[in-house]
Design a protein with these regions (language model features):
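N-terminal beta1-alpha1 ligand-phosphate binding loop
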Residues: 2-30
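A short beta-strand-loop structural module common to alpha/beta enzyme folds
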Residues: 32-42
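Cysteine-cluster motifs in flexible loop/terminal segments that predominantly coordinate metals
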Residues: 42-72, 200-205
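Helix-loop-strand module that forms the ligand-binding subsite of alpha/beta enzymes
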Residues: 57-147
Length: 205
């Protein structure tokens, strides 16, 4: 089994990376493979609403989003990490996840997911809420820890001093591994989620 992670920070080995790495270690100890994909520093386009993905089954902008989507099809779970920018998720990861979930959500449906957030001081829970909304609209079990998944520090070195934050990430990794194994056991026993066809309505009808 494999958990695919996204480092949504412009700093490849900063605080967000520390958080993801700590969760990855716990997953690895449970026999779960992990991969961390870095979002990079290059400008990332947001969703233009062109709806071409409905025909192409991928985003019309062929960049890291589509590369991640290909990996997502083979992954069993996900952890998305973001720094806090102005008390919310970083702009790049919002653009990334908007396009990823609009074009390739089927590749992630029913697969467990979590987000981790890094901040110097405040805005962590607001960012946490933003990222979790992608999972909860896509029928993805959300994995929790013993606290909200946040780590504090202005540098990677400072984040490594946040002992409670590091424990939160380890517990998250252990819980993710446990849920993945439960799902695998359920499938082996013939247990699958019961599906319903989506009903689309507007508020006025």
């Amino acid at each position: 089994m494999k958990v695919l992670m996204l480092n949504g920070s412009p700093h490849e080995h900063g605080c967000t990376y520390v958080a993801l790495s700590e969760a990855a270690k716990a997953l690895n100890e449970q026999g779960i493979e992990t991969e961390i994909v870095w979002i990079g520093k290059e400008p990332l386009e947001g969703c233009s609403g062109c709806a071409a993905c409905g025909k192409l089954w991928k985003c019309v902008v062929d960049d890291k989003v589509n590369e991640f989507a290909l990996k997502a099809a083979e992954a069993d779970g996900f952890i998305f990490g973001s720094p806090v920018h102005y008390a919310s998720a970083a702009g790049a990861i919002v653009s990334f996840m908007d396009r990823l979930f609009y074009s390739s959500s089927r590749k992630m449906t029913y697969k467990p997911a979590a987000c981790v957030v890094s901040c110097r001081r405040g805005g962590a829970t607001a960012t946490f809420d933003v990222l979790n909304k992608y999972f909860t609209i896509n029928q993805m079990p959300v994995v929790s820890s013993n606290y909200w998944n946040e780590i504090h520090g202005n540098t990677a070195e400072q984040a490594l001093q946040d002992l409670e934050g590091l424990q939160t990430m380890r517990v998250l990794g252990k819980n993710m591994a446990w849920l993945l194994k439960c799902i695998e056991a359920g499938k082996a026993a013939g247990v699958e989620p019961e599906k319903e066809k989506k009903i689309w309505t507007n508020f006025i009808r």
